[in-house]
Structure formats: C-alpha cells, structure tokens
Amino acid sequence: MLNVGATAPDFTLRDQNQQLVTLRGYRGAKNVLLVFFPLAFTGICQGELDQLRDHLPEFENDDSAALAISVGPPPTHKIWATQSGFTFPLLSDFWPHGAVSQAYGVFNEQAGIANRGTFVVDRSGIIRFAEMKQPGEVRDQRLWTDALAALTA
C-alpha cells in the first residue's frame, strides 16, 4: 500500500455513467477521498457506501471530492448507484483488471478484487491519509472526515 507522503498515481477511469474521470482533474482544485471497495451489491460495501451517501456533504463540497473505485464494470455500477441513490462517481478499475488498485497497493491478487483501501489526496497530489482493511473488516469513516478536515484547517 502506498504511504502517506507519496505522490498519488494518476488514473483515468470510467464512472457509472461511462464518463471519464481523472485524478489530475482535481489537482489544484480539490482534495480527493479515494475509496477502494471490493464489489458492488455486497454487504460491507453496501453499508460503507450507504454511509458515504448519507454523509456526502462532508466528503463532497467546495474543498473535496469523493471517488469510489472497484474492479466492477460501469453497467454494474450504474445499476447499483441507481438502486442505492449514489450520486458520487463509482469508478471502474475493470480493464486492465485492477491496474489502479495495483498502483495504490490495495489489489488482492488471490481474490482478483481491491481490498478496502482509503486514501486522502491533497490538492497537490500528495497522499495525506492511507489505510487498508482486509476482507470482512469495516472502515471507520470518522478517520476520513478528520483527514479531510486537517487539510482545510
């Protein structure tokens, strides 16, 4: 997993609406919360992204943006986003399979999916918060809000 202080690898991925999203597009403008999740329509992932949705103004505002990333394809993400009311981008790390997850060091080779990795990237592209949970472990989203708040203090 990439460490705090490292430069966040740039990427271009398709969201649930087939739109291209690049990390560098936020450079100089917003801090970015990157939330890697294993798969759509799974218990812990549903719960975590429901919490993100329910507290979205804390993560998606004038100072920050939230991007969720998994190896699932955009059509699956579209259905899940529609059913769950997710308005933030769900990015597809589908092909090359898991390339962005691998670049961030959160790809689970054995399972072929991303582990629950979370990164806060500042406006200059530097990682200011990094964590990774193993399958079955739930993340504490208060850590994300604290990390983002520290960048705007």
Swiss-Prot record:
GO terms for molecular function: peroxidase activity; peroxiredoxin activity; thioredoxin peroxidase activity. Its EC number is 1.11.1.29. Residues 2-153 form the Thioredoxin domain. One of its GO terms (biological process) is cell redox homeostasis. It catalyses: [mycoredoxin]-L-dithiol + a hydroperoxide = [mycoredoxin]-L-disulfide + an alcohol + H2O. Coiled coil: none annotated. Keywords: Antioxidant, Oxidoreductase, Peroxidase, Redox-active center. The active site is at 45 (cysteine sulfenic acid (-soh) intermediate). The active site is a conserved redox-active cysteine residue, the peroxidatic cysteine (C(P)), which makes the nucleophilic attack on the peroxide substrate. The peroxide oxidizes the C(P)-SH to cysteine sulfenic acid (C(P)-SOH), which then reacts with another cysteine residue, the resolving cysteine (C(R)), to form a disulfide bridge. The disulfide is subsequently reduced by an appropriate electron donor to complete the catalytic cycle. In this 1-Cys peroxiredoxin, no C(R) is present and C(P) instead forms a disulfide with a cysteine from another protein or with a small thiol molecule. Homodimer. Forms both dimers and octamers; a tightly-associated dimer and a ring-like octamer. Belongs to the peroxiredoxin family. AhpE subfamily. Thiol-specific peroxidase that catalyzes the reduction of hydrogen peroxide and organic hydroperoxides to water and alcohols, respectively. Plays a role in cell protection against oxidative stress by detoxifying peroxides. May represent an important antioxidant defense against cytotoxic peroxides, especially peroxynitrite, which can be formed by activated macrophages during infection. This is Alkyl hydroperoxide reductase E. It comes from Mycobacterium tuberculosis (strain ATCC 25618 / H37Rv). The lineage of its organism: Bacteria, Bacillati, Actinomycetota, Actinomycetes, Mycobacteriales. The gene is ahpE.
